[in-house]
UniProtKB/Swiss-Prot annotation:
The gene is polb. InterPro entries: DNA-dir_DNA_pol_X, DNA_pol-X_BS, DNA_pol_b-like_N, DNA_pol_B_palm_palm, DNA_pol_lambd_fingers_domain, DNA_pol_lamdba_lyase_dom_sf, DNA_Pol_thumb_sf, DNA_pol_X. It comes from the Eukaryota. It comes from Xenopus laevis. Mg(2+) 1 binds at D190, D192. This is DNA polymerase beta. PROSITE patterns: DNA_POLYMERASE_X. Binds 2 magnesium ions per subunit. GO terms for cellular component: cytoplasm; nucleus.
Length: 334
């Protein structure tokens, strides 16, 4: 998951901006994930509202906007600012911790530890690089590039390289670029790829070579430039498009997950998102007597105990089982 905020094309950009800022404060400083989720949900719903919101009362009609958020919207619309945010921005602890978490590899706990040691800025991090782990050093090295959104045109170029290399390695591989890119977004925070192969199922032994040989192939062609984490089923790293005569492309974050073939399409559905769409689909599945997660779809018995995973060979199979009309990825940005 990227730490960059998506650009807004909403008539309510000011409202969504302050909600996202409050969300990040609750997650990074207060560690209040429930408040983070509430602010993010409200921001997502308001971002899709087609007209300019004129009052908190109007906003409260939207699912996910409660009385407290509506009050903040009224304050923002009346004054152009929010007292709570002004206070947060003036607080050295809050602003420093929020900033440090923008470095990939630095979570809220590490950010607070660095802050307690007097490390508050990028220069402070550079002067204390011996305290950083490998992941954090790479995050610091490429901080400016990782802050930039990835235009869809660049995502398409990277997708072409990845799919071509994977297919040449073994045509039985299946790879899908997920996230907001698959939903048609004009920009993305990072490259999130799901990978599978018929040799790897939930019943078989682990097959780390299936992931590692793909990573090696992408390293050999100089597309993957750095490794952050490489396990049996997940790779986290850095990639870069080949430089052109008039352009050096930024370094980008890339994640590749190897998923058992029989769980692949539940994974594709989940990692395509959006978060709200996934929650709505899980709720609908429960109403129809199924439990759905990123791994499987299982029928629920009369006692509420889940049965064996159902066979799934496409995303559409999942929609069909739970009797929900299929929605293309571009129609899942709720």
């Amino acid at each position: 998951m990227s730490k960059r905020k998506a650009p807004q094309e909403s008539p309510n950009e000011g409202i969504t901006d302050f909600l996202v800022e409050l969300a990040n404060y609750e997650r990074n400083v207060n560690r209040a994930i429930h408040k983070y989720n509430a602010y993010r949900k409200a921001a997502s719903v308001i971002a899709k509202y087609p007209t300019k919101i004129k009052s908190g009362t109007e906003a409260k009609k939207l699912d996910g906007v409660g009385a407290k958020i509506a009050e903040k919207i009224d304050e923002f619309l009346a004054t152009g600012k929010l007292r709570k945010l002004e206070k947060i921005r003036q607080d050295d602890t809050s602003s420093s911790i929020n900033f440090l978490t923008r470095v990939t590899g630095i979570g809220p706990a590490a950010a607070r530890k660095f802050f307690d040691e007097g490390i508050k800025t990028l220069d402070d991090l550079r002067n204390n690089e011996h305290k950083l782990n490998h992941h954090q050093k790479i995050g610091l090295k490429h901080f400016d590039d990782f802050e930039k959104r990835i235009p869809r045109k660049e995502m398409l170029q990277m997708q072409e390289i990845i799919l071509d290399k994977v297919n040449n390695l073994d045509p039985e591989y299946i790879a899908t670029v997920c996230g907001s890119f698959r939903r048609g977004a004009e920009s993305s925070g990072d490259m999130d790829i799901l990978l599978t192969h018929p040799d790897f199922t939930s019943e078989s032994a682990k097959q780390p070579r299936l992931l590692h040989q793909v990573v090696q192939c992408l390293e050999d062609c100089n597309f993957i430039t750095d490794t952050l984490v490489k396990g049996d089923t997940k790779f986290m790293g850095v990639c870069q498009l080949p430089c052109e005569s008039d352009q050096d492309y930024p370094y980008r974050r890339i994640d590749i997950r190897l998923i058992p073939k029989d769980q692949y399409y539940c994974g594709v559905l989940y990692f395509t998102g959006s978060d709200i769409f996934n929650k709505n689909m899980r709720t609908h599945a429960l109403e129809k007597g199924f439990t759905l997660n990123e791994y499987t779809l299982r029928p629920l018995g009369v006692t509420g105990i889940a049965g064996e995973p159902l066979p799934i060979d496409s995303e559409k199979d999942i929609f069909d089982y739970i009797q929900w009309k299929y929605r293309e990825p571009k129609d899942r940005s709720e």
